[in-house]
Amino acid sequence: MKKVMLVFGTRPEAIKMCPLVKEFQKHPTEFETIVCVTGQHREMLDQVLTIFDVKPDYDLNIMKQGQDLYDVTARVLTGMRDVFKECKPDVVLVHGDTTTSTAAALAAFYQQIPVGHVEAGLRTHNIYSPWPEEMNRQITGRIATYDFAPTPLSEKNLQEEKAHGQIFVTGNTVIDALHMVVDKLKTDKALADEQINVLKNAGYDVTRLDGGKKLVLITGHRRENFGDGFISMVTAMKDLSEKYPDVDFVYPMHLNPNVRKPIHEVFGEDLTRPNFFFIEPLQYLEFVYLMEKSTVVLTDSGGIQEEAPGLGKPVLVMRDTTERPEALKSGTVHLVGTNHDLIVNEVSTLLDDAVAYEKMSKAVNPYGDGKACSRIVRALNGEAVDRYEVK
């Protein structure tokens, strides 16, 4: 039996790793499945663990007020050292591009434990965009023994870098997670009704959309956008809400003060508006429910670039670069950066032009078929694995 440890610490990681935990747990004779969380995003992480019913075996609980990247890296490195010495896993799986992933991979390397990198090979080729994520994933990629690339383009990036790890093209586990949650919401009316109540308590009455009203769903929290870029983004959102008084704009605000402060600078202390709703951060379940109800998604998130197209939603990305160019090529995503006029113009086009909207919403999602977790488990079990191909 192989002892496999999955390490993650943020909400996006948890969304993409919890389905993999559940898949490993289906094979108790082949794998002992161990879960270690770092708590890099404490409250938001715990919410996802509850949704997927995943109970960690180890919890580093590193979250502290005012911590920076130095603190996170040091705490994860030393915390994982002690966990690895006690647990002695045969392989450690980390995800993507977080500081948790890189520090955990480095800690495993120091003890010569093989590392599997889930969502390997994403690149912008600019180490400061996104920062620090681009360098994080490059470092993790150098350490990994197994590279689980979500797409053929990710595989190509790894091959060009001459990555020493064995590469498997699996699709992205976020599509597995999305399928699980959407199926739950479609088959369990009580659960769907519960999301309506949760959203209402968070500050938005989703029944406002029952008459065909359009919804622009917004998320924004990336470090590289803080400062003038974020002010420009928020100003564009304000101007759009005034230009389209019959369209609802909903922004679940990240807990980070660097996000909340510029919002108040632009909108004032009182955020109450007739068609703009600043609400508290949402758990994954209600966020997927709201995303499914949306017309357009405006975001600087990485994962949402993969998830929203799976629901047929056009995505405008408030970043200058993306490590997910497959979506640009397929037409499901457009880059708008932090440029005020470009954001306003692109959102306006999707709200006003039915042909442009249909072109984006009907484009093929290139990120997966819901079988990524199965491919990863079979790969680590030494079985033949079919290669994910973009249709």
Briefly describe each language-model feature range:
Residues M1-Y251, P257-K391:
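Nucleotide-activated sugar donor-binding and catalytic core shared by glycosyltransferases
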